[in-house]
Design a protein with these regions (language model features):
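Helical hydrophobic small-molecule/effector-binding pocket
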Residues: 85-109, 115
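Amphipathic alpha-helical packing segments from all-alpha helical-bundle domains
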Residues: 110-140
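Short hydrophobic clusters on alpha-helical segments that form packing/core surfaces
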Residues: 16-24, 66, 70, 92, ...
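Helix-turn-helix
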Residues: 15, 19, 23-57, 61
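N-terminal intrinsically disordered/low-complexity leader segments
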Residues: 1-11
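Alpha-helical DNA-contacting segments of helix-turn-helix folds
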Residues: 24, 57-66, 73, 106, ...
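Amphipathic alpha-helical linker/stalk segments
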Residues: 60, 64-87, 124-131
Length: 140
């Protein structure tokens, strides 16, 4: 009689990205390596390179997720006043306090290691929702 083989868990692109993003939040972007992501995800490095061409592609995905995370954070940040840019500034400061590693990645990192395609501060703050443009219109 043959033994029943246990079904292997599939390591998805979402699981890899979620793991790398969580590592960035907890430990900092510099600690996101293929071996460390694989260890945290409970797999070998093979699934990482099956879904990502190379680590640069994964790093870009983590960076994009961090930028989207900041935009979500800002959109949910309480609007306490009508002074233009005050809410944006307060959200920026609170994000730095609460998400130190993501803040460093987005706004402090000089990207000398070439780990990601860095956006300008304006691109991150403005986002698809036009946050900076919205604040400028409030000032008029």
């Amino acid at each position: 009689m043959r033994g029943i083989m246990a079904r292997k868990e599939m390591i998805t692109i979402d699981k890899i990205l979620d793991t790398a993003f969580a590592m960035t939040r907890e430990e900092g972007f510099a600690n996101v390596t293929a071996r460390r992501v694989a260890a945290k995800a409970g797999c070998s490095t093979q699934p990482i390179f099956r879904v990502y061409k190379n680590m640069e592609e994964l790093w870009d995905a983590v960076y994009e997720r961090a930028a989207a995370y900041f935009l979500d954070y800002y959109s949910l940040y309480p609007r306490t006043g009508k002074t233009p840019f005050a809410n944006l500034g307060m959200a920026y400061i609170a994000f730095a306090r609460e998400e130190r590693h993501l803040f460093e990645l987005l706004f402090v990192s000089d990207n000398q290691d070439g780990k990601h395609k860095k956006k300008s501060m304006y691109e991150i703050l403005n986002g698809d929702a036009g946050n900076v443009v919205y604040e400028i219109n409030l000032a008029r």
